[in-house]
Amino acid sequence: MRLSTLFLAGSGSAVLAAPTPSLMGDLLSLTNDIITTVTSTIVNDLASQVAALGCVLQTNANQHGQILNTAALTIEAIEVAAKRFTQICNWSKPGKQYINWSTYKANGVNLGAWLEIEQNYDTEWWAANVGSFPDEWTWCSTVGFSVCGPILEKRYASFFTIADIDKMGAKGINTLRIPTTYAAWTQVPGSGLYSGNQQGYLRALTNYAIDRYNMHVIIGLHSLPGGVNTLGIGEAFGHDAWFQNSTNLDYSFKAIDSVLNFIKTSGRQNAFTIAPINEASDNFAGFATPAGLTDAGVNWINTYIKGVLARIAKVDKRIPLMLQDSFFSEMFWSPFYPAGTNLVIDSHIYFFAAAGAYSQYVPAAVCGQAKYIGQGDGKFPVFIGEFSLQTLYNNTLSNRKTLYDTQVYAYQKYASGGAFWNGKMLNNVDGVDGEGMLQDYWSWEALADAGVVSNTIDQSYC
């Protein structure tokens, strides 16, 4: 969940005249019979369609574990301590070995808004090229791939380059999380997302990062055919047809097979983790809350993830799968997968919308809450796949290093580390509550230039 993905939804209620009890009973009885028959038929048909893809439709969503909503953290006012701490972080250096996320410690950065585009992260480029269109799908569908394609190719070649990898490597970054669209991996008939030379640019950058700096790379599918969350990052605004659709599931597996082939042919197979889904929600009114996924949505995600695990196993079980938790926490997903599954849970923690999140109070909250989010029930490791520095209130430029150092330290102490969102933000249009502009709190490279990111953790609150 980035700044561009937070929306608030309300619900209304209607007052109706009460029908007679007998009529109500008849209607309910008839409706229940119809719903039961239709639902049973739909589920059976879907199960057959999923079976044809070599999968089993999951139906045990009610067996989930505890929900710990990472998007609804409450920050309490405290007396802020003056002391800051210098901490030593032993970042992992995997070498030629496959990593174990239970012991791996990631000092990561996201390369977002590169192979999937987001308006907030490069406002001038968006205004000059995409204009008033809300997302890539609408833009390319309107102007045609012959127009948007060459523009996107230029962006792929320039937004992140080996110079950026050098900058990150110099600051001790050992992990890259790289979001992509499914169109980078497979062509879906009727899709408005551009399929071009994304893999070529990804290959050049990841080969360099792995060979020069021994970085580990998480390849993420931020979108899936049909849309996973009604947001632009999920495919396009208003799209959520990925759920309960076997055709879209089939194309999702085709994308996964392409990612696996990319990894297998890299000559660096040990250096990758696959993240097959991101911030999924089949009930957008409840996005980033426990209401954001229905039981049917949970079942569909588990059907997909178990299918992905089976495909990974055909290549090499040592390649980890990273499951983004949809803001539900590791504990929620834990019961669905047996111990020993090569699975790591990806949790996203942001404070730009957290209740009571004044900048001065957040570091103490991080120290207290990271343990519960990062450790879960202990069955599967947790990686904080996205975090930033913006808080809801009273942002100050001087407090950024404490916010950065505290999160980096706490997430490696209690979890498997984290990845800052984002590597770049070029946005001098949008402000924040307090000092500075949005990009002052969301751009890793700008933070590095300002001395906020350094080679030492010396301003941690804990």
Residue spans of the language-model regions?
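Substrate-binding cleft of secreted/luminal carbohydrate-active enzymes
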Residues: N107, Q375-Y461
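An active-site-proximal structural segment forming one wall of the substrate-binding cleft
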Residues: K154-L176, G190-S223, G234-T273
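Fungal secretory targeting signals
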Residues: M1-S22
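Short acidic/His/Gly/Ser-rich catalytic and metal-binding motifs that mark active-site loops
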Residues: A184-V188, P225-E235, N283-G286
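Structural recognition of the beta-strand scaffold that forms the well-ordered cores
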Residues: A106-L115, N174-T180, H216-I219, S223, ...
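N-terminal carbohydrate-binding accessory modules
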Residues: T20-I173
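Extracellular glycoside hydrolase catalytic/binding regions
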Residues: F85, K254, N261, T265-T273, ...
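Helix C-cap/helix->beta junction micro-motif
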Residues: A209-Y213, V315, Y414
